[in-house]
Amino acid sequence: MLAGLLVASAARYTDLVHVRKRGRSMSLAASMQWDLLPPLTLRTEQVVVAGMLEPAYEVAGDGFDHSINGDRVDVALFDGMGHGIGSTLLTTLAMGAYRHQRRERRDLASTHATIDDAIALQFGSDAFVTGVLVRLDTASGALELTNAGHPSPLLLRDRRVVGELSTEATVPFGVGGGSGSPLVRTTLQPGDTVVLYTDGVVEARRPDGDEFGVDRLADLLEREASSERAPEEVLRRLVRAVLDHQGGPLRDDATLVLLRWTGGPAADEVIPVQPGSVEPS
């Protein structure tokens, strides 16, 4: 544990760790985006939240956040429209509004409306951010989700993708008029995994135009579930599959977040792991 704390502390004060993780030089926008990320993984005896963002290096717009506070787990995934610094600023504002509401212990409906208003007031009607907000009660497995024009998360149960956690058609943050979004409510079973992703994952294309697609993502998730690998390793393998499918530099950021609930008694200790990226081949 002490060694881990020393590494985490050193990472805050030296740029060498960050440069090596990135693999190659980033644009200013992508660097800003990278520095916005939380620890890669949070883990307790009840739950694991793991995220991975593979940046397009010249593009920036994806961002994710997560926290564990007692019996409450919050997860968010955002994708700002466009490319470059403008896209990063959109996501930064959405993330800031989200974190403020979460720390004020607001419900998801209020949080959704606040993010929507913040984007609209600052950027007008010409900009938007898609996103998904998730809240899990680890004592009961009760889960709430709100969606803002984003790909619907997948639910993995008993090593099978059993469906999407979807609502009726929703609109992105910034164009909803503060009206919020319908809540999805469900109850997880011990061992369930919720998988959030951005369009950069499923829209990665081979030179012949073949998209990676949701079906391929679901198939790989089921294969990885059968392997019983740790969520962090599952993410690395999924992102590697996206990169291999693309066969070259990504055209858009590709981000995945896994939320796995194991059930069982609550634990006070939360173990963070610092951000990282898949090393280029």
Residues of each region from the PLM?
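Divalent-cation-assisted or electrostatically stabilized phosphate/pyrophosphate-binding catalytic cores
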Residues: 181, 189-190, 212-225
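Short, well-structured alpha-helical segments that form the helix of a local strand-helix-strand
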Residues: 108-119, 230-242
